[in-house]
Amino acid sequence: MKTKRHTVLDLFCGAGGLSLGFEKAGFQVIQAIDRFEPAIQTYRYNLGTHVESHDLSQPIKLQPATAIIGGPPCQGFSSAGLRQSKDYRNTLVGKFARFIADLRPCAFVFENVEGFLTAENGERVIELLDPLVEAGYRIHLRKINAANFGVPQHRKRVIAVGGLGWEPSFPEYTHTAYGAPGAHLASQILPPTPSILKALHTLPQADSRPPGAIQGHFSRQLSEIELQRSLALKPGQTMRDLPEELQHDSFRRRAFRRVRDGTPSEKRGGAPSGIKRLKPDDPSKAITGGMQGEFLHPYEHRPLTIRECARLQTFPDDFIFFGNSTDQMQLIGNAVPPLLAEHIAKNLLEDLDRFDGNDYEENTGEILSFVPTLSSGVSPALRHVIDLVKQRYFRQPIIERLMLWD
């Protein structure tokens, strides 16, 4: 058995998706921190007693380790909910960076939602990068789609990987997902991302009530109107495809804009899609903490179960979640998919095994690559952030490094 040589601290660990992936890759997680009690219970049951309950906005003694990993809470700028720029949790990104700069581990991994890039006009990006570059870290910061790493869902996230005085690599894609940028090229050499059906087909029939044969694999009975909506929706369709009499009142109010005389005009894009039936042969839409009941099973007339959501996040069936159903969905939806974490960890482990301490260069912090988009189009808000990063960290014109596709 290979000895676990490299140690890890997992800050803001949640249910432990990052820790699980890093453990499977061969790292040893020696300390994990969170403040949400269901997360602490879930982590302790599945991954070990090295988890601690603590508010990381307050002082704490952290153990020295090879790497620090983590995803500071994103609720203040998540697109899954209302953005709140004054949410105190936003400042935890800077706290995370300062922990790394002070402890000076050999490497770090950071994960967050795509809204992180444009939050506060790019201030959160600077809050992350400034202390780390000053401390000597050489950093890749890229937006990725977890589907390109074999996770059966289109999940766009921001990943940063850094090495202290040495140059880490960024993990290569392992799969190609239909509709993902570069899919027409990658499909020639990479296997397709698993579909929803491939990910879920070995689960037994969902029970009609808890506890179920597998934890979380049950579905409540639908109301009459919910059943009618489910029966009417075909794979790929959403609430806006329903006849008006089946649409939810709140959807109708927001889906129609009114002109001066009060007459409703045509439906607009940007209205909430409400429930949606997933396509069986595609990866899922992103699983989020607040989506319970939103996604309908591709064929069955019911929402996805909690366990099906966990599977789409690549948690094993024997991974037990604590708390009520809302807590469990929050833990699952906020987690880093363990499979994505494992790919990142394996790549970092290979880098560390190749790293020669003599290659260390003092005070050589820099941004090695910055890839803030997966498409050719750039919004004004994102263009502002790109310009901000270029002016702050790059001394020569290297736009191709900023818009890297690989």
Question: Regions from the language model: what does each represent?
Answer:
Residues M1-L9, C13-F27, R157-L331, A335-D406:
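S-adenosyl-L-methionine-dependent DNA methyltransferase catalytic core
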Residues K2-C106, F110, E114-T118, E123-I126, ...:
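Core alpha/beta nucleotide-donor-binding catalytic domains of modification enzymes
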Residues E52-H54, E114, Y137-N148:
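Conserved S-adenosyl-L-methionine
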Residues Q63, P152-R157:
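A short, glycine/Asx- and small/polar-enriched loop/turn
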Residues P73-Q75, E114-G115, A147-F149, G165-E167, ...:
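Short, solvent-exposed loop/turn segments at secondary-structure junctions
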Residues V109-V113, R142, F322:
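Short beta-strands and strand-loop turn motifs
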Residues L128-K143, L164-P168:
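A SAM-dependent methyltransferase catalytic signature shared across enzymes that methylate proteins
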Residues F149-P152, L278:
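A short beta-turn/loop motif at secondary-structure boundaries
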